[in-house]
């Protein structure tokens, strides 16, 4: 294995920390990018353009990280007092949008100026334990709260609505289909739910396996919903058109599937904490391919990416990982 690391350089510009690192390059084109020690990057999102920035939530330090994958340089932007960011997604405006559990708010960071705008949830919503954001076809931000909530922010007006989840606590991962429908997974509730994006009503959809611990969800190009099962170590697929399910067991001993993401070729990517690996699943051949981390305890909690690249945040190792998606 070849690893090339440059000396760490740091300076401060406009209150944002900038650090320069070269990636560690591993076998099969897998690359690792160190970030600030103790930041414990939780979620990750990739700007869609090739070579564009990679955003990550530095949950332990209350910052948004911005990585330039071409140089290995990363920048950190403080999000506000008490911040504990969880999820991040790149919106239709090209900006990173963050679910911030510490501030009980949705946060936008301007990709050019680094200006931070905080959209606080209504006071009567209480502490929601914000988790994952996604955008609907009208450019509105939807979000989950593990305390038993989901909600919607209209960036144009600043209006925020919050609903109680039909089965209480557990809403975790969230996704939008190509047609603009929104789904979430309930970890504690072991189900998936479809949200009517106009009324806000959520309809529960039960997977065949009980108590599976549906953690995260992602849509493929056909609008099928892929679900990572934390408790049972499976990946499930719900086809809304047929109203049918299929499920597959991840390889290995006692797998625990945390994150799920679907690439532009409709390959399904997962993280298996038991195997300390990213796992690719081909729905056509029904074959799995594993990409173990070169360090123990990677604890990848989220996957996102863009054409040709799957990105994950190794929260246990304070670094990001990129696996070629081909």
PLM segments and residue spans:
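An edge-strand/N-cap motif at the start of beta-rich repeat modules
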Residues: 27-56, 67, 323
């Amino acid at each position: 294995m070849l690893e090339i690391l440059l000396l760490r350089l740091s300076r401060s510009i406009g209150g944002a920390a900038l650090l320069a690192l070269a990636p560690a390059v591993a076998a099969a084109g897998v690359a690792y990018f160190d970030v600030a020690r103790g930041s414990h990057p939780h979620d990750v999102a990739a700007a869609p353009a090739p070579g564009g920035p990679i955003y990550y939530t530095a949950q332990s330090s209350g910052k948004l990280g911005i990585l330039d994958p071409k140089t290995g340089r990363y920048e950190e932007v403080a999000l506000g007092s008490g911040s504990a960011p969880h999820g991040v997604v790149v919106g239709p405006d090209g900006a990173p949008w963050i679910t911030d559990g510490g501030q009980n708010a949705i946060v936008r960071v301007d990709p050019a100026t680094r200006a931070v705008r905080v959209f606080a949830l209504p006071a009567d919503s209480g502490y929601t334990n914000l988790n994952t954001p996604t955008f609907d076809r009208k450019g509105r931000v939807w979000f989950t709260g593990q305390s038993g909530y989901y909600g919607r922010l209209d960036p144009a007006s600043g209006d925020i609505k919050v609903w109680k989840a039909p089965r209480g606590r557990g809403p975790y991962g969230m996704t939008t289909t190509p047609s603009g429908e929104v789904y979430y997974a309930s970890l504690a509730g072991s189900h998936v739910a479809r949200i009517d994006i106009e009324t806000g009503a959520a309809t529960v959809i039960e997977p065949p396996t009980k108590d599976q611990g549906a953690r995260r969800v992602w849509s493929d190009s056909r609008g099928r919903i892929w679900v990572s099962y934390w408790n049972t170590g499976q990946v499930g697929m719900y086809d809304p058109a047929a109203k049918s399910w299929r499920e597959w067991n991840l390889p290995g001993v006692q797998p625990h599937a945390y994150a799920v993401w679907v690439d532009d070729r409709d390959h399904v990517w997962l993280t298996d904490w038991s195997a300390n690996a990213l796992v690719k699943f081909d729905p056509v051949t029904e074959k799995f391919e594993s990409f173990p981390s070169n360090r123990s305890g990677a604890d990848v909690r989220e996957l996102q990416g863009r054409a040709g690249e799957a990105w994950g945040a190794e929260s246990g190792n304070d670094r990001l990982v990129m696996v070629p998606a081909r």
